[in-house]
Amino acid sequence: MSRPPSRGSAPAPAPPARPRPPTPPGAGLRLASSPRNPALRLARALQAKKVRRERRLLVAEGEDLVDAALAHGVEPVALLIDAERVGADDPRVRATEGLRERYLVPPRLLAQASGLAAAPRVLAILPQPPVRSFRDVAFPPALGLYLAGVADPGNVGTLVRTAAGLGADWLALGPGSADAFHPRAVRAAMGATFAIPILEGVAPADLATRGGFAVVGAVPRGGVAPWEADLVRPLVLALGAERGGLGGALEELAAGREVVQVTIPQAPGAESLNVAAAGAALMAESVRQRARSGRSGSGTLSGR
């Protein structure tokens, strides 16, 4: 017969706590099995500029775009993933564990929500970058980009990507230019939508009233060669429609300041360059001149 423990003895140790099971990948994912799902309906509605403008949202289609947005710290409003081709262990699912609106979507429904010919594997609804004015950006710019009547969303998106990659301070959209948050523009920008300030609805007169910079306008003929122009000083590069050019916008931008017209030399009889290609060539020439002079642009490019 065992004796009872003495009054001074220590209590028996508590049994060790059971470890919590790890959270399974994709916990919290829901199945969107109906086209009436709110996130699917919103993704379809955001194909329209009016809805994008009212809601200040955009659609990113594909893994690369969603990854770029997440890398820039953008928090999605909703994440839609292909239930058959991706699954719950996708890294984008892990990166958005705190997001309530995450759905596994049958491919047929995901295709209906997308503007692509082939449905993406991942689609995210994202907040647009904040509305900006000239008070919010570097001014005068080392290099700013002004688009007047560039109506194709793909060209706008490509110019956003190029401007960000070549160190421009900002990109401003003038009258007649496509929405930089159009799905095609977002795809062409490949994540640069979140990397460079974008100013919307900037009339030439709004820019002309500001000082401290030169205007360099791209024209199809009659201008100086880009390497003959001073592209080192603070400047705004103005690009227009491929057919109509800058039109009257160049005169409005001048407003008493120096305006330099540049023309990229081409082979005889060749068609004019695509506006995105012309913009890339001119921005690259500005980078080259700055590198040779030892001056940097927005702090990311130096003479070396």
Predicted regions and their residues:
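Arg/Lys-rich RNA-binding interfaces used to dock onto structured RNA substrates
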Residues: 2-153, 176, 287, 294-304
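RNA substrate-binding interface of SAM-dependent RNA methyltransferases
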Residues: 4, 71, 102, 125-223, ...
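Amphipathic alpha-helical repeat scaffolds
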Residues: 62, 151-159, 271-277
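Short, acidic/turn-prone active-site loops that include or flank metal/cofactor-
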Residues: 84-86, 107-109, 176-178, 201, ...
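Short, charged, surface-exposed secondary-structure boundary motifs
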Residues: 89-91, 113, 207, 226, ...
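Short, hinge-like loop/turn segments at secondary-structure boundaries
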Residues: 96-97, 122, 188-192, 233-235
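Structured adenosyl-cofactor binding patch, chiefly the S-adenosyl-L-methionine
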Residues: 124, 162-166, 177-194, 251-304
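Active-site/ligand-binding-proximal alpha/beta "capping" segment
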Residues: 216-270
